[in-house]
């Protein structure tokens, strides 16, 4: 049990921030989750952006990509890294590079970078650094972009402090998913009210 390897998706950090108990019910207890209209719309928007990107994309190597001083962009970059008995998986919505830095961008229909969203993007930054550590010679920036209007909601240089905060969150989530730690349910009844598990969750505050 102590050496159990746990798979964690980068997007799970946002879910855990919403409610660890909900994530536990879905990922460990495997209770079915019905896709909402918002989830379906999000998938369609991402697919549309990817298809638009493919039409104009020019092949290049990762070495050329990270050395570029002109703005270059890739989309739907899938990465994984194994450490601390965790297989971390992630798909970066948009990865860009210019002379000043590398930009790890997530598209969401949000106008505020909640901590769960930031941890998700830091997960992508962590994956990027561990997959391309020999190629990255520029600062890495975490970016949240509004999916609908394209405006940048949040942009911040990825630092050692962010990495430390992310790693602590990853180890906590590892212990929740391996059932070494009890998940913490939300204390916000508004979250319970919109949760698909509110009829079966013993901690639900929905009335």
What is each of the regions a protein language model found here?
Residues 93, 106, 120:
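Acidic active-site catalytic centers that drive phospho-/nucleotidyl reactions
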Residues 102-106, 151-153:
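Short small-residue beta-strand/loop micro-motif enriched in glycine and branched aliphatics
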Residues 31-32, 110-113:
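Short, surface-exposed beta-strand-loop junctions and turns on beta-sheet-rich folds
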Residues 70-87, 111-112, 130-207:
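Metal-dependent nuclease catalytic regions and adjoining charged, substrate-binding loops involved
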Residues 1-102, 207:
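Metal-dependent nuclease catalytic cores that hydrolyze phosphodiester bonds in DNA/RNA
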Residues 117-130:
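Short, charged, amphipathic alpha-helix that recurs within catalytic cores of restriction-modification
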Residues 98, 107-108:
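Structural signature of nuclease core domains in nucleic-acid processing machines
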Residues 106, 116-117, 205-207:
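A short secondary-structure junction signal
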């Amino acid at each position: 049990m102590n050496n159990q390897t746990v798979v964690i998706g980068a997007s799970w950090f946002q879910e855990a921030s919403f409610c660890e108990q909900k994530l536990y019910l879905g990922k460990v207890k495997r209770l079915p989750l019905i896709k909402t209209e918002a989830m379906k719309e999000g998938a369609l928007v991402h697919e549309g952006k990817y298809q638009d990107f493919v039409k104009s994309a020019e092949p290049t190597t990762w070495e050329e990509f990270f050395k570029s001083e002109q703005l270059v962009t890739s989309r739907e970059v899938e990465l994984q890294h194994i450490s601390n008995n965790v297989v971390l998986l992630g798909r970066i919505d948009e990865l860009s590079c210019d002379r000043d830095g590398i930009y790890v961008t997530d598209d969401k229909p949000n106008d505020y970078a909640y901590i769960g969203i930031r941890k998700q993007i830091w997960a992508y930054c962590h994956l990027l650094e561990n997959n391309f550590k020999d190629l990255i010679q520029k600062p890495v920036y975490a970016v949240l972009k509004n999916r609908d209007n394209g405006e940048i909601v949040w942009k911040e240089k990825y630092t050692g402090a962010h990495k430390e905060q992310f790693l602590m969150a990853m180890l906590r989530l590892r212990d929740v998913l391996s059932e070494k730690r009890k998940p913490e349910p939300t204390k916000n009844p508004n979250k319970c009210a919109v949760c698909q598990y509110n009829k079966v969750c013993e901690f639900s505050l929905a009335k």
